[in-house]
Swiss-Prot record:
HAMAP family: GTPase_EngB. GO terms for biological process: division septum assembly. The lineage of its organism: Bacteria, Pseudomonadati, Pseudomonadota, Betaproteobacteria, Burkholderiales. The gene is engB. This is Probable GTP-binding protein EngB. Keywords: Cell cycle, Cell division, GTP-binding, Magnesium, Metal-binding, Nucleotide-binding, Septation. CDD domains: YihA_EngB (cd01876).
C-alpha cells in the first residue's frame, strides 16, 4: 500500500509567513477551479474526503497541507500541498489579487517544493492561467507533471491527440531554459481510475518515500570475465 494512502490533514495557511518551518519535501497540486484538483488528490490518496472542494468555485483561498508518514511516525516524510484553484471569472478582484501573490510567491520561492503537479481539463489544457503557473515555476528547474484530468470525457483518438499536443507544448517550454528539466504529462480520469498508479509513482518519487526507493530498478551485478588461465573442466 502506498504511503500516500495514509496522508492526513496537517494545516491550513493563508499567508506565506505561516508556512510550516520544516525541511521535508513538498509536492504541490495546482489547477483551475473546475479542473478536478480535489477529486484527483483524494483518488491518489485513496480517500474520499481528504481534500475538499468548495461548492462555489473559486472560494477556496487557502493553502492546505497534508502530511505523509507511516501511522505511528512522529514526523512527516513529506507534504502534499493543495493550492487554491485559480481562474474563476466571478471571483472578486481582491480574491484574484490574493491568488496571484499567494500562488506565484509560493511556487517561485518555496525551497522545500520538490515538484509541481498541474491539473488541466483534458478538453481545454494550457489555458492562459495554466501557462502562467508553468512560467512561474519553470525557472526553478524543478519538475512539473501535468495531469490531463477528465480524460474519460474524450474519445480514445481525441485523448491521444490531447496528450500529443500537451507534450509538444511542454517540449517548447523545455527548449526555453538551460539545463535538463523534467516536464511530463499523462492522461488521468478519476471516474475511470485511469493513470492513478503512474501519478502515484511520480509523487512518491518526488517525496523520496520508501516505496519509491524500493521501486527503483536494481543494477545487474557485473558478470565476471573468465581468466584466460582459468582451468577448464
Amino acid at each position: 500500500m502506498s504511503l500516500l494512502h495514509q496522508a492526513r490533514f496537517f494545516i491550513t495557511v493563508n499567508h506565506l509567513r505561516d508556512l510550516p518551518a520544516t525541511a521535508v519535501p513538498e509536492v504541490a497540486f495546482a489547477g483551475r477551479s473546475n479542473a478536478g484538483k480535489s477529486t484527483a488528490i483524494n483518488i491518489l490518496c485513496n480517500q474520499k474526503r481528504l481534500a475538499f472542494s468548495s461548492k462555489t468555485p473559486g472560494r477556496t483561498q487557502h493553502i492546505n497541507y497534508f502530511s505523509v508518514m507511516p501511522a505511528k511516525a512522529e514526523d512527516p516524510l513529506g507534504f502534499l500541498v493543495d493550492l487554491p484553484g485559480y481562474g474563476y471569472a466571478e471571483a472578486p478582484g481582491e480574491t484574484k489579487s490574493h491568488w496571484v501573490h499567494l500562488l506565484g510567491d509560493y511556487v517561485k520561492a518555496r525551497q522545500q517544493l520538490a515538484g509541481l503537479v498541474i491539473m488541466m481539463d483534458a478538453r481545454r489544457p494550457f489555458t492562459d492561467l495554466d501557462c502562467q503557473m508553468v512560467e512561474w515555476f519553470l525557472p526553478t528547474g524543478k519538475p512539473i507533471h501535468v495531469l490531463l484530468t477528465k480524460a474519460d470525457k474524450l474519445t480514445n483518438n481525441d485523448a491521444s491527440r490531447a496528450l500529443m499536443a500537451a507534450r509538444k507544448v511542454l517540449a517548447d517550454y523545455r527548449a526555453q531554459i538551460d539545463g535538463d528539466v523534467s516536464l511530463t504529462v499523462q492522461l488521468f480520469s478519476s471516474l475511470k481510475r485511469r493513470g492513478i498508479e503512474e501519478a502515484q509513482r511520480i509523487v512518491a518519487g518526488w517525496l523520496c518515500l520508501p516505496e519509491a526507493l524500493e521501486a527503483e530498478p536494481q543494477a545487474e551485478p557485473a558478470k565476471k570475465t573468465p581468466s584466460p588461465n582459468a582451468q577448464r573442466g
